[in-house]
Design a protein with these regions (language model features):
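Hydrophobic helix-and-loop "lid/oligomerization" segment in the mid-to-C-terminal part
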Residues: 2-4, 11-141, 161, 212-437, ...
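Acidic-glycine-rich active-site phosphate/pyrophosphate-binding loop
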Residues: 75-76, 172-185, 344
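Hydrophobic, well-structured modules enriched for small/aliphatic residues and gly/pro motifs
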Residues: 91, 148-151, 158, 165-173
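Short alpha-helices
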Residues: 100, 178-216, 221-233
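Generic beta-sheet signal
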Residues: 115, 145, 168-170, 184-186, ...
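Short gly/pro/ser/thr-enriched loop/turn and capping motifs at secondary-structure boundaries
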Residues: 120-122, 151, 171-176, 190-192, ...
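Intrinsically disordered, low-complexity regulatory tails of plant transcription factors
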Residues: 151-152, 235
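A contiguous loop/helix-start segment that scaffolds small-molecule binding in enzyme catalytic cores
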Residues: 256-259, 444-486
Length: 486
């Protein structure tokens, strides 16, 4: 297909300083100063915070409106030796967030447990069947990680059984919120927490920090922020604001990590901890962590991250590496089959592509959908077909909210969830055709046409000679580089 690439210079925000002020204040290369002018940094103090961020730059966890209520319930549960279950998600973000809360809470009580649903048996999020099992284990408090914000029915059911639920989630909210004991989600309506793009692991980390501050529990925050960093990079949230701070600190802390799982994962990927980058986490570490949840069961990955038995950890890393190789093979197969259909039918014939196949592995379709969306610059939805209820995964393009598009057809779905860039859902096979029709109608009515020109932005134009040793050294201060911080 024809590529529609348009390059535009990023708009400079109004600021009370000149590039010359930046050069003088921070002893930076003049070209670097002009690049900083394109960032959303209104004052020289903002620039200082951006360039030299540390733990003190993290936002106050107590800005979450519901966090005191969550802390009080957790404190009471620990003091009363109640059974607590941390119920996470099976992707790298959910696994890291679950590990964070399990590590800190289990350091206080032996009645703390971690559980991830099986993608193929229970599917995403809380279910009434799982709540029954937790009730049978005398659970009185569930803390969700990276899920729960749409589990209205399930949390009502838990409440009737006498189980309190604290939700930590970053996905988009529906009109009706669950009647949970406490909800920590920056996207919650009227939520005052100022940074809205935290991932699930980062929210779990913020809750852990608040526990430490309130002396409810204590733990090495260097290890916890390293796990939050992995979740942040793996979930491809914008590397701006607090996310960039978490990634920056975590990439520094991983250099001296004592976590055996991280040490063995880096060794398996042939990575030097002292030279590890955001790309290494995103393309080498995160896929290995994701592999179990995509292809089998991720609960052993939790055990691996919490174990001090090197032989056990080494064996689990080896298994993950093999599973990841199988995942790569499946992903390439799905991509090739889908791309062949698209090319045969003309890539421009749809605003949103919806493709289904009974042989497509439901744990891998999201990755393939992301590659296709990037290649053809339009949203892609891939569905793993079955005789009745099918599983789908959606990936979007910049500027088009796929969550809202899917929500517009929620009456055709069994369940769904996600955010502006990605979503997952279950759908009856008989509804797929109508679902595709409505999605494309919605896309047309909401102006997707103007987004199909793949606009790429750059920060600065300069003459030859920009790449001095000083400039190359200074540019590293903008790292870590990733989504929304190229």
């Amino acid at each position: 297909m024809q590529k529609y690439n348009i390059w535009e210079i990023r708009k400079k925000i109004s600021s009370a300083y000149l590039a010359e002020d930046i050069v003088k204040e921070f002893n930076l290369d003049s070209n670097m100063a002009h690049i900083l002018k394109s960032k959303e940094l209104g004052t020289l103090a903002d620039i200082k915070e951006f360039l030299y961020a540390g733990y003190e730059s993290l936002l106050d966890s107590f800005l979450f409106s519901d966090i005191k209520r969550a802390l009080n319930r957790i404190d009471a549960a620990l003091k009363n030796n109640e059974v607590i279950y941390i119920y996470g998600d099976y992707d790298a973000d959910g696994i890291m967030g679950t590990c964070i809360l399990y590590k800190i809470l289990s350091s206080v009580s032996s009645n703390v447990h971690a559980l991830l649903p099986n993608r193929f048996k229970q599917g995403y999020g809380l279910s009434c069947d799982m709540i029954d099992k937790l009730k049978a284990a005398d659970t009185s408090l569930i803390i969700t990680v990276d899920n729960g914000i749409t589990a209205v029915k399930e949390i009502d059911y838990a409440s009737k059984l006498g189980i309190d639920v604290i939700i930590t989630d970053h996905h988009e909210c529906n009109e009706e919120l669950p009647q949970a004991y406490s909800i920590l989600n920056p996207k919650k309506p009227n939520e005052p927490y100022p940074f809205k793009d935290l991932c699930g692991a980062a929210i779990a980390f913020k809750l852990a920090l608040a526990m430490i501050e309130q002396k409810i529990a204590s733990y090495d925050i260097c290890e916890l922020i390293t796990l939050a960093m992995i979740g942040t990079i793996a979930d491809i949230v914008p590397l701006t604001g607090e996310n960039r701070i978490i990634a920056l600190i975590g990439l520094n802390e991983i250099k001296k990590t004592k976590n055996l799982a991280l040490i063995e994962l880096m060794d398996d990927a042939n990575l030097n901890p002292h030279e590890i980058t955001c790309a290494d986490i995103g393309f080498k570490i995160a896929p290995r962590i994701n592999a179990a949840g995509r292809m089998t069961d991720a609960n052993e990955t939790i055990r691996m991250f919490c174990s001090n038995d090197r032989s056990f950890v080494k064996s689990k890393v080896s298994v993950l590496s093999e599973i990841n190789k199988f995942r790569q093979t499946e992903e390439k197969k799905i991509y090739a089959q889908a791309a062949q259909i698209v090319e045969h039918e003309n890539p421009d014939s749809r605003y949103i592509w919806v493709l289904s196949n009974p042989s497509w592995h439901e744990g891998v379709i999201g990755i393939s959908a992301g590659r296709l969306a990037e290649e053809y610059n339009r949203p892609f939805i891939l569905i793993s077909e079955s005789d009745n209820i099918c599983k789908g995964s959606a990936r979007s393009i910049s500027g088009f909210n796929i969550f809202n598009a899917i929500k517009n057809s929620e009456h055709l779905l069994e369940r769904f969830g996600g955010h502006s860039a990605a979503a997952g859902f279950s759908i009856n096979k008989k509804n797929i055709s109508e679902f595709e029709r409505r999605l494309n109608e919605y896309a047309y009515e909401n102006g997707i046409s103007k987004l199909l020109y793949n606009t790429k932005y750059y920060d600065y134009e300069s003459s030859d000679g920009i790449f001095t040793q000083k400039f190359i050294s200074d540019i590293e201060l903008l790292s870590p580089f990733g989504y929304k911080n190229p």
